[in-house]
Amino acid sequence: LVKCRGTSDCGRPCQQQTGCPNSKCINRMCKCYGC
């Protein structure tokens, strides 16, 4: 899991770790979508 301050913090980690193209920052944790 990746901590974040905003959705912009999540895009690269989501792509690198999961291959998911979409992401959001929810409760200071990245959520990855579109896997």
Curated annotation (Swiss-Prot):
A single Gene Ontology MF term assigned here is:
ion channel inhibitor activity
Q: Please name every pair of cysteines joined by a disulfide bond in this record.
A: C4-C25, C10-C30, C14-C32, C20-C35
User: One Pfam family this chain carries?
Assistant: Toxin_2
List the residues marked with site Aromatic residue of the functional dyad: Y33
Example of a GO cellular component annotation carried by this entry: extracellular region
Subcellular localization(s) per the UniProt record? Secreted
Q: Does the keyword Magnesium apply?
A: no
Tissue specificity is: Expressed by the venom gland.
Q: Where is this site: Basic residue of the functional dyad?
A: K24
The record makes one more remark, namely:
Pi1 analog that is synthesized with a phosphorylation at Tyr-33 (P-Pi1) suffers a 200-fold decrease in LD(50), a 200-fold decrease of potency in competition assay with apamin, and a 58-fold decrease in inhibiting Kv1.2/KCNA2 channels. Negative results: does not or very weakly inhibits KCa2.2/KCNN2 (Kd> 1 uM) and Kv1.1/KCNA1 (no effect observed at 5 uM).
The entry's family comment says: Belongs to the short scorpion toxin superfamily. Potassium channel inhibitor family. Alpha-KTx 06 subfamily.
Q: What does this protein do?
A: Potently and reversibly inhibits the insect voltage-gated Shaker (Sh) potassium channel (isoform alpha (B)), the mammalian voltage-gated potassium channels Kv1.2/KCNA2 (IC(50)=0.44 nM), and the calcium-activated potassium channel KCa2.3/KCNN3 (Kd=330 nM). Its effect on Kv1.3/KCNA3 is controversial, since this channel is voltage-independently inhibited in PubMed:9464266, but is not affected in PubMed:10931199. Furthermore, this toxin competes with apamin (a small conductance calcium-activated potassium channel inhibitor) for binding to rat brain synaptosomes.
What is the protein name given in its UniProt record?
Potassium channel toxin alpha-KTx 6.1
